[in-house]
Amino acid sequence: MVDEIIVSGPVIIKQGKLRVIKEDKDDFYKLPGGRVEKDETLEETCAREIKEEIGGEIIILEKLSTLILSENPTTHKKMRIELHHYLAELKNPLEINPIEPIKEIKWLSLDQIKRKKYVVSPNIRYLLEQGDLK
């Protein structure tokens, strides 16, 4: 039987740039987010994860595309990962403090992501293809 997890996270875009994080274990940029806990909605997970990872609070604006992966992009372990994305904005953009294991929080230009200047997670590429990142 294949392991299965459901993940939810915010997509924060401002002035043509995407808010991303990089963890110690990763060699790519990714969106904040994480596993849905028992009795938690996808939206609640989204808000909790951003607070845990960068110390900020968000306002969820709309649901974006969902991506199903068959492999963990970090460990390459075969598993089913259901990634739910929500367009969101930070309530107070100045209150950003990375929390371990987050080693970097950055704004990446969508144009540079499209031109593959950065190594990013599969869901960022997917959201670009779906037209969700504008």
Where are these regions (language model features)?
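Conserved hydrophobic "DFG−1" position in protein kinase catalytic cores
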Residues: 12-13, 20, 88, 107
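Conserved N-terminal beta-strand and adjoining loop/helix that marks the start
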Residues: 1-18, 84
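Nudix hydrolase/Nudix homology domain
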Residues: 27-29, 95-134
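Active-site-adjacent beta-strand/loop module that shapes the phosphate/pyrophosphate-binding cleft
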Residues: 68-95, 106
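Conserved Nudix-box catalytic region and its N-terminal flanking loop in Nudix hydrolases
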Residues: 14-52, 56
